[in-house]
């Protein structure tokens, strides 16, 4: 049974085009201004609050994001992070009045629900990866940690996972062990959004 409607265009939900504009590429630099890491993230507010994986930012002196239309914007401050679940919330110095942002899902998808992963792309394509929620475990209060029937490629870590109605519920995370061909994981986007530390800017 193939659950991978990989890069299928036919069934792309109508919200995909707009939602993909919220996904960006992240580049972090070390103190010698050499590239440290590259990855993905996405906006969750129109004024530039975004989510990604904390691993990307470890040891970084500065970071920039590259939007789907090629605009480069600086990361201004880390707003919160969780090392164990590898999430980070940060503010981007946006270049316009506002950016396209994803709406956080109010209701967590249940086991068996169809879900979509939106990759970062500079092309105007409607590519996505379809999968299903295998299970959802509760973590730290009312948040969820998801196991998904979905194959994850390396460059998809921290891409947004969407419900069928186009709301973001999770950040894609690396799978490890034998199940990597069929299974991946996701941390609750609302958990990432709840992270708060006293504002640290990269200049500090």
Give the positions of each predicted feature.
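Catalytic nucleophile loop of clan PA
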Residues: 152-172
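Terminal peptide-recognition signature
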Residues: 24-26, 41, 48, 52, ...
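Residue-level recognition of beta-strand microenvironments
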Residues: 44, 78-81, 136, 164, ...
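C-terminal cap/linker of serine protease catalytic domains
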Residues: 11-17, 60, 97-99, 168-204
């Amino acid at each position: 049974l193939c659950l991978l409607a990989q890069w299928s265009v036919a069934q792309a939900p109508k919200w995909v085009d707009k939602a993909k504009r919220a996904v960006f590429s992240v580049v972090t630099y070390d103190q010698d201004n050499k590239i440290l890491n590259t990855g993905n993230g996405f906006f969750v507010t129109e004024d530039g609050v975004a989510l990604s994986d904390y691993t990307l930012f470890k040891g970084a002196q500065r970071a920039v994001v590259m939007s789907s239309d090629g605009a480069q914007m600086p990361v201004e401050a880390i707003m919160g992070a969780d090392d164990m679940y590898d999430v980070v919330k940060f503010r981007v110095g946006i270049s316009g009045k506002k950016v396209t942002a994803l709406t956080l899902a109010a209701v967590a998808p249940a086991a068996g629900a169809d879900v979509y992963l939106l990759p970062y792309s500079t092309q105007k394509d409607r590519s996505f990866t379809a999968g299903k929620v295998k299970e959802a475990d509760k973590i730290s209060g009312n948040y969820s940690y998801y196991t998904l029937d979905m194959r994850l490629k390396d460059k998809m870590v921290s891409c947004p996972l969407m419900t069928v109605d186009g709301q973001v519920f999770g950040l894609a995370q690396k799978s490890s062990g034998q199940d990597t061909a069929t299974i991946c994981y996701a941390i609750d986007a609302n958990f990432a959004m709840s992270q708060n530390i006293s504002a640290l800017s990269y200049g500090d």
